[in-house]
Amino acid sequence: MKSWRAVAVVLALAAEGFLVSCDAGGDGAPGADVTGPAVPSGGGSPGGATGGSSPHSYEISGAKALDVRNENGSVRITVGSGPMSVTETLEYGAVKPATRHQVEGGTLRLVGSGCGNSRPCKVDYVVRVPPATPVTVRVDNGEVEADGVTGSVDLGTGNGGVTGSALGARRASLTSGNGTVEATFAVAPQEVTATAGNGMVTVTVPPGTAYDVRARTGVGMRQVSVPTDPSSSRRITATTENGMVTVQTG
């Protein structure tokens, strides 16, 4: 009787070892987990080491406008000839962030998603658009930059700076919940709205044009040095709850 029990134990252990070896198999092997958390190509695993940085570039033809929605990471917009060009750089640890893009109604829509509680996790976008392309960007956490854009711009982040440089847009909106907002124009704009919840706001326009300026700060200095005319059809609204507000020529 004792010898039978010993044999039974040996058989049970052998069976357990077989199951473990199956679970350790590669893709498609018995026991492989195809529905579990995403594993970074850098060799990370849930709760494990950093997956690294993964850049990816592509071009999109036929789009006439750009709309970017990014949960965590920076967005930089530049201007150039040819079709729209996108470079996504992913930085992640145990879980790789998801990205997707599609052209819908003539608008290229880019979406960068998060990784739950896994860190690090961000998607940095660099997008080159043709001249006169309207641009909309929304970021939860990260910097937003637009350089030389001549189409309308609507840029916003919950946390981070927003910078527009050498803008040729007639209409521009730049917003940050927590961070500086800077807008510099190469040509006189028709309407500018620059807003920060916590941070400095600076708007710089070419000399020689008068504006209806509405500048306000909750806590901080207010400095307006552009020609002002309340009846002007050109309007600049610059506000912050905490920080300095400057509207100037340059």
Enumerate the predicted regions with their spans:
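Short linear S-[DN]-x-LW-Φ motif typified by the pepsin-like aspartic protease active-site region
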Residues: 3-6, 10, 23-104, 128, ...
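C-terminal motif of bacterial Sec signal peptides marking the signal peptidase cleavage site
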Residues: 18-21
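Short, T/G/N/S-enriched strand-turn elements that build extracellular solenoid repeat scaffolds
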Residues: 55-57, 74-79, 98-100, 124-128, ...
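Structural recognition of beta-strand segments within beta-rich domains
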Residues: 69-70, 118-121, 127-129, 136-138, ...
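Secondary-structure transition/turn motif
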Residues: 89-93, 111-118
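Right-handed parallel beta-helix
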Residues: 136-175
